[in-house]
Amino acid sequence: MARKIRRDDEIIVLAGKDKGKLGKVLKVLPAADRLIVEGVNLVKKHQKPNPQLGVTGGVIEKEASIHVSNVAIVNPKTGKADRIGFRFEDDKKVRFFKSDGELV
């Protein structure tokens, strides 16, 4: 089944501690139905130093995954959350915004 939200899509968080935040999808994890979104769901990770890899230790902040049901794609025309549909154009499956029918 095709994914409604893909990498580099602009999304808005609908639920959770980061509700209302906008971000760009960095990575899609289809097996778990989760996304990694830039600047959203930040967690602190305690990193152990590893001189062989040149990694310094300390506490780093990184993005954790968020479930796909807690986000919606943003329609650039309206700037609001929108739903996605699929249709065929010239024997090719394309995504479109349900509110205005424009292609994603």
Curated annotation (Swiss-Prot):
Domain of life: Bacteria
Disulphide-bonded residues: none
GO molecular function, one term: structural constituent of ribosome
GO BP: any one term: translation
Keywords, ordered alphabetically: Ribonucleoprotein, Ribosomal protein, RNA-binding, rRNA-binding
InterPro entries in UniProt: KOW (IPR005824), Rib_uL2_dom2 (IPR014722), Ribosomal_uL24 (IPR003256), Ribosomal_uL24_CS (IPR005825), Ribosomal_uL24_KOW (IPR041988), Translation_prot_SH3-like_sf (IPR008991)
Gene3D superfamilies, per the entry: 2.30.30.30
Family indicated by similarity: Belongs to the universal ribosomal protein uL24 family.
Known function: One of two assembly initiator proteins, it binds directly to the 5'-end of the 23S rRNA, where it nucleates assembly of the 50S subunit. One of the proteins that surrounds the polypeptide exit tunnel on the outside of the subunit.
Subunit structure: Part of the 50S ribosomal subunit.
UniProt-recorded name of the protein: Large ribosomal subunit protein uL24
Organism of provenance: Pseudoalteromonas atlantica (strain T6c / ATCC BAA-1087)
Gene name, Swiss-Prot/TrEMBL: rplX
